[in-house]
UniProtKB/Swiss-Prot annotation:
Record-annotated disulphide pairs: none
Pfam family, one: DBI_PRT
Record-annotated membrane-spanning stretches: none
GO molecular function: nicotinate-nucleotide-dimethylbenzimidazole phosphoribosyltransferase activity
Source organism superkingdom: Bacteria
Residue runs in coiled coils: none
Protein name: UPF0284 protein P9301_04631
Family per record: Belongs to the UPF0284 family.
SUPFAM superfamilies for the chain: Nicotinate mononucleotide:5,6-dimethylbenzimidazole phosphoribosyltransferase (CobT) (SSF52733)
Length: 385
């Protein structure tokens, strides 16, 4: 991986330095004119014990995405409605995203899908909330194809209407598992490459869950991206496919802020496009993530696997943010491999660095917000919340 003077690491296709620097310039030029979407989605895959660190148990994972969205918008607040779930280690990456979005004066748009309740904060309504979470992928019937197509069409329409570059982020407990299922449905052997919010990825559990889902899906030879999402995917993937394609049709650059979940969306789009305009499509699409997620090189290998399969040149950028100097265990846990990414932490912190903010400034603000959220009782202390 190549590192710039800002400490930003590139991964994936690193064919020439000029292209890398052009990507940096695109980002820097658009920091103040960027539409940030946080897509919060529910899948009952998250209810499998041990599948996710986005909440200490299945019950707490039901409100994780809502709490993440609330914290992204409001930060530490006495009037908070949703408690952030207690984690085995670390703290929600929404902390990083909140701090950095405030630094760059960004106002994220929240898109709830399959959450089951109406958030009190401003949000974009794209489907009936009574639809609820998608089914567990083990059923092989995550959603109806009608729902998938509706989410795709809504995302497409929003994307095509955009007049500025886009950053797509997510909070989807269980979403890394549905991402892996989608990639394996298209023949990619990625079980050792897909990461996890957990310190140790539950690889064997995931293999069993995904194997069962793929068997129950009964795919046909002509099954397409929509069939795959309907079988083993989640609402985030369906909507983001449309949003990504729509934004590119509107000639807007797109930052996918995350890891394997964003790569699953890219794969779904590449399968859908086939050979049509894929090079033009991918040129101004790139992955942005945290340095913690690229530490072991698995994400780099995963990006290159997609590059090879689809003959594209997808490039990734990793934020230089680190918590080595922090005095708090919850932040230092990131350096040990806990949590790693989520809620757009990589992409939004990367933008803060490109806007001139220093690591120590971001760390200091994260510490202040952590102190406040703990003081206000914003993190649940219940292990069975």
């Amino acid at each position: 991986m190549y590192s710039t003077e800002l400490g930003i690491n590139f991964f994936g296709n690193e064919s020439n330095k000029k292209r890398q620097l052009n990507k940096i310039e695109i980002l820097k030029k658009n920091i103040k004119n960027l539409k940030i979407f946080l897509i919060i989605a529910g899948t009952n895959t998250s209810q499998i014990p041990g599948i996710s660190a986005a909440g200490i148990n299945p019950k707490s994972r039901r409100t994780t995405a809502l709490a993440d969205a609330e914290f992204l918008l409001e930060g530490a607040s006495k009037g908070h409605k949703y408690k952030l779930p207690l984690l085995n280690a670390g703290v929600t990456p929404a902390l990083i995203s909140h701090v950095c979005s405030k630094l760059i004066n960004a106002y994220p748009v929240i898109v709830p899908l399959g959450i089951g309740v109406k958030p009190y904060f401003n949000h974009l309504v794209v489907e009936d909330r009574n639809l609820g979470p998608s089914n567990c992928l083990t059923t092989g019937k995550s959603m109806t194809k009608e729902r998938v197509l509706n989410l795709y069409e809504k995302g497409l329409a929003i994307g095509k209407s955009l007049k500025q570059p886009v950053l797509i982020s997510e909070s989807v407990p269980g979403g890394t598992t549905t991402a892996q299922a989608v990639m394996e449905a298209f023949g990619l052997q990625v079980s050792n490459l897909v990461g996890s919010s957990l310190f140790k990825a539950p690889r064997e559990l995931r293999r069993q869950v995904i194997k069962r889902g793929l068997l129950n899906a009964h795919f046909k030879a002509d099954s397409d991206s929509f069939d795959v999402v309907a079988a083993v995917g989640d609402p985030f993937q369906a909507f983001s496919m449309g949003l990504l394609i729509g934004a590119r049709l509107a000639k807007q650059p797109v930052i996918l802020s995350g890891g394997s979940q964003m790569l699953a969306v890219i794969l779904l789009v590449l399968e859908f496009l086939g050979e049509k305009n894929k090079d033009e499509f991918i040129e101004d699409v790139f992955i942005a993530t945290t340095g913690w997620l690229v530490k072991d090189n698995s994400l780099n290998d995963l990006v290159n696997l997609i590059n090879e399969k689809y003959d594209v040149k997808l490039l990734g950028l990793a934020s230089p943010l680190n918590f080595k100097s922090s005095k708090y265990k919850e932040l230092k846990d990131y350096e040990l491999g806990h949590v790693k990414e989520g809620v757009g932490a990589g992409g939004i912190s990367l933008l803060a660095f490109l806007d001139g903010f220093k690591n120590e400034e971001i760390v200091s603000l994260c510490q202040q917000n952590l102190e406040m959220m703990k003081g206000l009782g914003q993190i649940s202390l219940e292990k069975d919340c």
